[in-house]
Amino acid sequence: MIPALFGLGCILGGLLSPQCLGILLIYFALTVAYSLYVKKVVLLDVILLAGLYTIRIMAGSAAVGIWPSYWLLAFSMFLFLSLALVKRYSELVIMRSLEGKQAKARGYEMTDGELLATMGTASGYLAVLVLALYITSGTAQVLYGRHQLMWFLCPLLLYWISHIWLIAHRGRMHGDPLVFATKDPTSRVLIFLMLAIAVSAV
Protein backbone atom coordinates (compact mmCIF):
# COMPACT_ATOMS: atom_id res chain seq x y z
CA MET A 1 0.00 0.00 0.00
CA ILE A 2 2.74 2.45 0.98
CA PRO A 3 4.84 1.84 -2.18
CA ALA A 4 1.72 2.37 -4.30
CA LEU A 5 0.94 5.67 -2.57
CA PHE A 6 4.56 6.75 -2.91
CA GLY A 7 4.52 5.92 -6.61
CA LEU A 8 1.27 7.81 -7.09
CA GLY A 9 2.70 10.80 -5.25
CA CYS A 10 5.79 10.80 -7.48
CA ILE A 11 3.65 10.64 -10.62
CA LEU A 12 1.47 13.52 -9.46
CA GLY A 13 4.51 15.50 -8.38
CA GLY A 14 6.17 14.95 -11.74
CA LEU A 15 3.05 16.09 -13.55
CA LEU A 16 2.95 19.30 -11.51
CA SER A 17 6.60 20.25 -11.94
CA PRO A 18 10.11 18.77 -11.77
CA GLN A 19 10.77 20.93 -8.69
CA CYS A 20 7.76 19.45 -6.92
CA LEU A 21 8.94 15.91 -7.70
CA GLY A 22 12.42 16.69 -6.42
CA ILE A 23 11.07 18.11 -3.18
CA LEU A 24 8.82 15.06 -2.69
CA LEU A 25 11.77 12.70 -3.15
CA ILE A 26 13.86 14.67 -0.66
CA TYR A 27 10.97 14.71 1.80
CA PHE A 28 10.49 10.94 1.44
CA ALA A 29 14.20 10.23 1.93
CA LEU A 30 14.40 12.43 5.03
CA THR A 31 11.21 10.91 6.46
CA VAL A 32 12.63 7.40 6.06
CA ALA A 33 15.90 8.52 7.64
CA TYR A 34 14.00 10.03 10.55
CA SER A 35 11.89 6.92 11.12
CA LEU A 36 14.81 4.48 10.93
CA TYR A 37 17.56 6.39 12.70
CA VAL A 38 17.35 10.14 13.30
CA LYS A 39 14.42 10.04 15.75
CA LYS A 40 16.78 8.39 18.23
CA VAL A 41 19.50 11.04 17.86
CA VAL A 42 19.24 13.83 20.43
CA LEU A 43 18.80 17.33 18.92
CA LEU A 44 19.18 16.13 15.34
CA ASP A 45 15.65 14.72 15.59
CA VAL A 46 14.03 18.08 16.35
CA ILE A 47 16.07 19.90 13.71
CA LEU A 48 15.00 17.38 11.08
CA LEU A 49 11.37 17.58 12.22
CA ALA A 50 11.44 21.35 11.78
CA GLY A 51 13.04 20.86 8.38
CA LEU A 52 10.35 18.40 7.30
CA TYR A 53 7.59 20.86 8.17
CA THR A 54 9.42 23.55 6.20
CA ILE A 55 9.83 21.21 3.23
CA ARG A 56 6.06 20.71 3.24
CA ILE A 57 5.67 24.44 2.69
CA MET A 58 8.16 24.26 -0.16
CA ALA A 59 6.29 21.33 -1.72
CA GLY A 60 2.96 23.13 -1.52
CA SER A 61 4.47 26.24 -3.07
CA ALA A 62 6.11 24.24 -5.86
CA ALA A 63 2.78 22.54 -6.58
CA VAL A 64 1.17 25.90 -7.38
CA GLY A 65 4.24 27.24 -9.13
CA ILE A 66 5.18 29.85 -6.52
CA TRP A 67 8.51 29.58 -4.74
CA PRO A 68 8.24 30.62 -1.07
CA SER A 69 10.19 33.65 0.07
CA TYR A 70 13.26 33.25 2.23
CA TRP A 71 11.38 35.22 4.89
CA LEU A 72 8.74 32.49 5.07
CA LEU A 73 11.31 29.69 5.12
CA ALA A 74 13.29 31.33 7.94
CA PHE A 75 10.13 32.06 9.92
CA SER A 76 8.78 28.54 9.54
CA MET A 77 12.11 26.91 10.42
CA PHE A 78 12.38 28.76 13.74
CA LEU A 79 8.69 28.31 14.56
CA PHE A 80 8.62 24.59 13.79
CA LEU A 81 11.87 24.04 15.67
CA SER A 82 10.21 25.58 18.72
CA LEU A 83 7.20 23.29 18.29
CA ALA A 84 9.41 20.22 17.84
CA LEU A 85 11.29 21.11 21.01
CA VAL A 86 8.10 21.68 22.98
CA LYS A 87 6.95 18.22 21.94
CA ARG A 88 10.12 16.63 23.29
CA TYR A 89 9.98 18.77 26.41
CA SER A 90 6.38 17.78 27.11
CA GLU A 91 7.33 14.11 26.72
CA LEU A 92 10.02 14.59 29.36
CA VAL A 93 7.59 16.26 31.75
CA ILE A 94 5.07 13.45 31.34
CA MET A 95 7.74 10.74 31.75
CA ARG A 96 9.02 12.44 34.91
CA SER A 97 5.54 12.35 36.43
CA LEU A 98 5.28 8.63 35.65
CA GLU A 99 8.79 7.31 36.31
CA GLY A 100 10.56 9.96 38.38
CA LYS A 101 13.78 11.86 37.82
CA GLN A 102 15.62 8.91 36.22
CA ALA A 103 13.16 8.66 33.33
CA LYS A 104 14.19 9.19 29.71
CA ALA A 105 12.24 10.06 26.58
CA ARG A 106 13.69 9.38 23.10
CA GLY A 107 17.24 9.70 24.42
CA TYR A 108 16.58 12.91 26.37
CA GLU A 109 17.20 12.87 30.11
CA MET A 110 15.34 14.75 32.82
CA THR A 111 18.26 17.12 33.24
CA ASP A 112 17.85 18.17 29.60
CA GLY A 113 14.44 19.70 30.24
CA GLU A 114 15.65 23.17 31.20
CA LEU A 115 17.95 23.32 28.17
CA LEU A 116 15.17 22.19 25.81
CA ALA A 117 12.85 24.86 27.21
CA THR A 118 15.51 27.55 26.76
CA MET A 119 16.26 26.54 23.18
CA GLY A 120 12.58 26.15 22.34
CA THR A 121 11.41 29.50 23.63
CA ALA A 122 14.42 31.23 22.04
CA SER A 123 13.63 29.60 18.69
CA GLY A 124 10.00 30.67 18.94
CA TYR A 125 10.95 34.25 19.74
CA LEU A 126 13.39 34.25 16.82
CA ALA A 127 10.42 33.44 14.59
CA VAL A 128 8.74 36.59 15.93
CA LEU A 129 11.92 38.56 15.22
CA VAL A 130 11.95 37.30 11.62
CA LEU A 131 8.31 38.37 11.31
CA ALA A 132 9.12 41.85 12.66
CA LEU A 133 12.03 42.24 10.24
CA TYR A 134 9.79 41.11 7.38
CA ILE A 135 7.15 43.71 8.28
CA THR A 136 9.77 46.46 8.00
CA SER A 137 11.09 45.14 4.69
CA GLY A 138 10.25 46.56 1.30
CA THR A 139 8.70 43.23 0.31
CA ALA A 140 5.95 43.47 2.92
CA GLN A 141 5.25 47.10 2.09
CA VAL A 142 4.71 46.17 -1.56
CA LEU A 143 2.53 43.12 -0.91
CA TYR A 144 0.41 44.57 1.90
CA GLY A 145 -1.42 47.85 1.41
CA ARG A 146 -1.88 48.26 5.17
CA HIS A 147 1.29 46.56 6.32
CA GLN A 148 1.28 48.58 9.57
CA LEU A 149 -1.55 46.35 10.80
CA MET A 150 0.81 43.39 10.69
CA TRP A 151 2.63 44.73 13.73
CA PHE A 152 -0.28 43.40 15.79
CA LEU A 153 0.79 39.90 14.73
CA CYS A 154 3.99 40.12 16.77
CA PRO A 155 2.48 40.39 20.28
CA LEU A 156 -0.16 37.79 19.42
CA LEU A 157 2.47 35.33 18.19
CA LEU A 158 4.64 36.07 21.23
CA TYR A 159 1.69 35.33 23.48
CA TRP A 160 0.84 32.10 21.66
CA ILE A 161 4.40 30.73 21.79
CA SER A 162 4.66 31.62 25.48
CA HIS A 163 1.25 30.05 26.11
CA ILE A 164 2.26 26.80 24.41
CA TRP A 165 5.43 26.56 26.46
CA LEU A 166 3.62 27.38 29.70
CA ILE A 167 1.12 24.61 29.03
CA ALA A 168 3.97 22.17 28.34
CA HIS A 169 5.79 23.25 31.50
CA ARG A 170 2.68 22.46 33.53
CA GLY A 171 2.49 18.97 32.02
CA ARG A 172 -0.73 19.60 30.11
CA MET A 173 0.66 19.19 26.61
CA HIS A 174 -0.16 15.76 25.23
CA GLY A 175 0.99 14.80 21.74
CA ASP A 176 1.62 17.05 18.77
CA PRO A 177 1.47 20.79 19.66
CA LEU A 178 -0.20 21.54 16.31
CA VAL A 179 -2.99 19.09 17.15
CA PHE A 180 -3.19 20.63 20.61
CA ALA A 181 -3.57 24.10 19.06
CA THR A 182 -6.66 22.97 17.13
CA LYS A 183 -8.33 21.91 20.39
CA ASP A 184 -7.08 24.61 22.76
CA PRO A 185 -9.56 27.54 23.05
CA THR A 186 -6.84 30.13 23.63
CA SER A 187 -4.87 28.96 20.61
CA ARG A 188 -7.99 29.02 18.45
CA VAL A 189 -8.75 32.62 19.36
CA LEU A 190 -5.17 33.75 18.79
CA ILE A 191 -4.90 31.97 15.43
CA PHE A 192 -8.22 33.46 14.32
CA LEU A 193 -7.07 36.96 15.30
CA MET A 194 -3.76 36.53 13.47
CA LEU A 195 -5.51 35.33 10.32
CA ALA A 196 -7.96 38.23 10.51
CA ILE A 197 -5.11 40.73 10.84
CA ALA A 198 -3.19 39.19 7.94
CA VAL A 199 -6.27 39.40 5.70
CA SER A 200 -7.04 42.97 6.79
CA ALA A 201 -3.49 44.07 6.01
CA VAL A 202 -3.73 43.07 2.34
Give the residues covered by each predicted segment.
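Transmembrane alpha-helical segments that form the membrane-embedded catalytic/substrate-channel core
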Residues: F28-Y37, M58, S76-S97, L126-A132, ...
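Alpha-helical transmembrane segments of integral membrane proteins, especially early/N-terminal helices
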Residues: Y34-A50, M77-Y89, D112-A122
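A C-terminal functional module that forms or caps the active site or interfaces directly
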Residues: L126-T182
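Multi-pass membrane catalytic core of lipid/isoprenoid biosynthesis enzymes
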Residues: M1-L24, Y70-L81, A117-G124, P185-V202
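Cytosolic, membrane-interface loops and tails of multi-pass inner-membrane proteins
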Residues: R88-L115, G171-D176
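Helix-coil boundary and interhelical linker segments in multi-pass alpha-helical membrane proteins
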Residues: C10-G22, I57-F75, A132-W151, V199-V202
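Intramembrane alpha-helical segments
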Residues: M1-V64
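Small-residue-rich segments of transmembrane alpha-helices in multi-pass membrane proteins
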Residues: I47-A63, F78-F80, A103-G113, A181-L193
